[in-house]
């Protein structure tokens, strides 16, 4: 299992949660990156406001740490409504969902993180709520049980998931606005780093921000986490200001290399190169070779490596690319 304190893991690390909340943008104009998504949202929100209606139900999907929760909160702020947040695993019974739905006010936002992990019984309750703003619930047990319908105010369900393919077709079809978040480019990430540094009252120059962004795996959550660790280094070892040199020294010490890789990324790449002669290697064999679960490889390690061109996924298995060999100053063997 990957250690919970892996510095560049995109999932939330508990001690960082409060600080991350303070750094989050509140409105679309403050939100950096995801230009197409922002442009679409502006139109959808303005149209809903002109009609005086709830925004259509929205599914936000993509790798972890890219701002799905932040976008849900921005939608509520832009619409001028309340937001209630929960997650799929928490909603164990139909009554858990019913309690949330019956406390919504008109046009409110209900945010369900990890919506792909909803139980089937809860998902069934959600269908009429999304389509007709009605709640069908069973009262009582056994022969005396009866179904009652409750009218709900119009509301917007915002679902977030890292595994859109795991959603059932009926649930996925009920979202009128699907939004995919992509990894951020270095320019946008450096802008986020500079904004976060201002919130932290930290002096940072542009080159320092770019260096942190370059090693942040295209992920704002990782960029903010690295910024906090670089700040610690700058305050103890230097004058307190973050420059390119300070950022390089700090991140090298933290074992985050120039590509944003840590030991787990290098372990995976070297396993493909050394143990499987560059591949192809099946997912189960690769998982066994590095001592990780296949889900961890698919959901946490692989997406960035594939997106950056270090690993190629083929029908026969994973292959290390020329770029992976170059990263370790190795010569790629001739194709088999």
UniProtKB/Swiss-Prot annotation:
CDD domains: AAA (cd00009). Residues 185-255 are annotated as: Small ATPAse domain (RuvB-S). GO terms for cellular component: cytoplasm; Holliday junction resolvase complex. GO terms for molecular function: ATP binding; ATP hydrolysis activity; four-way junction DNA binding; four-way junction helicase activity. Mg(2+) binds at residue 69. It comes from the Bacteria. The keyword Transport does not apply. It is found in: Cytoplasm. Coiled coil: none annotated. Residues 4-184 are annotated as: Large ATPase domain (RuvB-L). ATP binds at residues 24, 65, 68-70, 131-133, 174, 184, 221. Belongs to the RuvB family. Has 3 domains, the large (RuvB-L) and small ATPase (RuvB-S) domains and the C-terminal head (RuvB-H) domain. The head domain binds DNA, while the ATPase domains jointly bind ATP, ADP or are empty depending on the state of the subunit in the translocation cycle. During a single DNA translocation step the structure of each domain remains the same, but their relative positions change. The RuvA-RuvB-RuvC complex processes Holliday junction (HJ) DNA during genetic recombination and DNA repair, while the RuvA-RuvB complex plays an important role in the rescue of blocked DNA replication forks via replication fork reversal (RFR). RuvA specifically binds to HJ cruciform DNA, conferring on it an open structure. The RuvB hexamer acts as an ATP-dependent pump, pulling dsDNA into and through the RuvAB complex. RuvB forms 2 homohexamers on either side of HJ DNA bound by 1 or 2 RuvA tetramers; 4 subunits per hexamer contact DNA at a time. Homohexamer. Forms an RuvA(8)-RuvB(12)-Holliday junction (HJ) complex. HJ DNA is sandwiched between 2 RuvA tetramers; dsDNA enters through RuvA and exits via RuvB. An RuvB hexamer assembles on each DNA strand where it exits the tetramer. Each RuvB hexamer is contacted by two RuvA subunits (via domain III) on 2 adjacent RuvB subunits; this complex drives branch migration. In the full resolvosome a probable DNA-RuvA(4)-RuvB(12)-RuvC(2) complex forms which resolves the HJ. This is Holliday junction branch migration complex subunit RuvB. It comes from Shewanella piezotolerans (strain WP3 / JCM 13877).
């Amino acid at each position: 299992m990957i250690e919970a304190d892996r510095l560049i893991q995109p999932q939330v690390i508990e001690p960082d949660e409060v600080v991350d909340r303070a750094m989050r943008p509140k409105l679309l104009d403050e939100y950096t990156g995801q230009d197409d998504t922002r442009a679409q949202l502006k139109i959808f929100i303005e149209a809903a406001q002109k009609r005086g209606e709830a925004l259509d139900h929205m599914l936000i999907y993509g790798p972890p740490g890219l701002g799905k929760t932040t976008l849900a909160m921005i939608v509520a702020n832009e619409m001028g409504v309340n937001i209630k947040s929960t997650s799929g695993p928490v909603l164990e019974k139909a009554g858990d969902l019913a309690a949330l739905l019956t406390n919504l006010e008109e046009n409110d936002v209900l945010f369900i993180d990890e919506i792909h992990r909803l139980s089937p019984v809860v998902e069934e309750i959600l269908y009429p709520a999304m389509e007709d703003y009605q709640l069908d619930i069973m009262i009582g047990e056994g022969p005396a049980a009866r179904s009652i319908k409750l009218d709900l105010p119009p509301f917007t369900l915002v679902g977030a998931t890292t595994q859109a393919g795991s959603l059932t077709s009926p649930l996925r079809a009920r979202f009128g606005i699907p939004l995919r978040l992509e990894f951020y480019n270095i320019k946008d990430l450096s802008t986020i780093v500079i904004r976060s540094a201002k919130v932290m009252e930290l002096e940072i120059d542009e080159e320092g921000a770019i260096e942190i962004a370059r090693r942040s795996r295209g992920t704002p959550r990782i960029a903010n986490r690295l910024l906090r660790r670089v700040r610690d280094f700058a305050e103890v070892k230097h004058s307190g200001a973050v420059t390119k040199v300070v950022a390089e020294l700090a991140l090298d010490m933290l074992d985050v290399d120039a590509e944003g890789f840590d030991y787990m990324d290098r372990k995976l790449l070297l396993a493909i190169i050394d143990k499987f002669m560059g591949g192809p290697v099946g997912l189960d064999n690769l998982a066994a070779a590095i001592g990780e679960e296949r889900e961890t490889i698919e959901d946490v390690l692989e997406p960035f490596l594939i997106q950056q061109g270090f690993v190629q996924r083929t029908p026969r298995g994973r292959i290390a690319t020329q770029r992976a060999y170059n990263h370790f100053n190795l010569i790629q063997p001739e194709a088999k």
